[in-house]
Structures are given as C-alpha cells and as structure tokens.
Amino acid sequence: MGYLYETHMHTSQGSACAHVPGAEMARLYKEAGYTGIVITDHFWGGNTAIDRSLEWADWVNGFCEGYEDAKREGDRIGLQVFFGWESGYNATEFLIYGLDKQWLLDHPEIRDCTVEQQHELVRRSGGIVVHAHPFREAPYILEIRLFPAFVDGVEGINVGNRDPQWN
C-alpha cells in the first residue's frame, strides 16, 4: 500500500490566492486517493487573506481557520491533516513544518524575522524550513534568490496552480 501526501496547499480562509476552503480541500484530496495533506497558507509577509491590522492573537486565530476546518473534516473522513505555513520575503517563499498554532501565538516576533532569523527560531523550536518553488519564474518574482544555509530542504515539484506557467 502506498502513501500520497500533498505538502503545500492553501485554503481560501488563509490565502488570498486560494479559491477553496479547508474542509472542501480535505474532501477533494480524500476523494483523489491522498493519505494526507499539509495546509500551508500564506503567512504574514506573503499573500495572506487575513487583515494584518488585527491584534496578533486574532490574526493567528483567523490564519488557522482553514487548517482547523480541514483537520476537523480530515478526522471525520480519515484523511491526515497537518499544519504548516508559507512565509514570504519579497517573493522568496519558505514552507514551515513541525510547529503549531500555539507556537505562533507564543512567537509574534516571527512576523519581523529575516530569512536567517526565521531559520534559527524555527529550528531551535523543533521545526524545519523548506524553500518553496525556488526556481519559479513569474511576474511578481523580480529575482530568484537561494538560501542554502537557511533551509532544511527544497520543494522539487510545485503544481496545481490555476495558471500553468507557475507550475
């Protein structure tokens, strides 16, 4: 028996670019034969759907809604659902895995971290940093920037975008 996981997905609750809410994403991926998914909505410095003028706790609660809905539905239908996020630095993006909502609530300083500081804080806390779609060419990406000393992995395949040129 094989395992199939989607490790980079956005929900309409957390990411401005997404069109489908978390619970529906869970159902769609279960129907497609997936074992599990990781919700990685766009974080503070990226294409987030959450109002940055909110107090930090309110922002985090709103940010986590897509994941929480997907997790509830995943538990109900037998799909593993994990939490992560995609941080953005001038169109250079990183997937963060292994941390949770409480960690975000306890670390508001993550909003202002540099790439280097993010890696240090995430790693010290037990998480990992993966460079998302490092070679994507798109109008919003002015330059391709690589940070080999500040990532634990690199996303090799990124597909499923509405515009195929970004796959």
Stretch-by-stretch model annotation:
Residues E137-I141:
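Alpha-helical scaffolding within the catalytic cores
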Residues M1-E116, A149, G156-N167:
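A metal-dependent hydrolase metal-coordination microenvironment
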Residues P134:
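Extracellular glycoside hydrolase catalytic/binding regions
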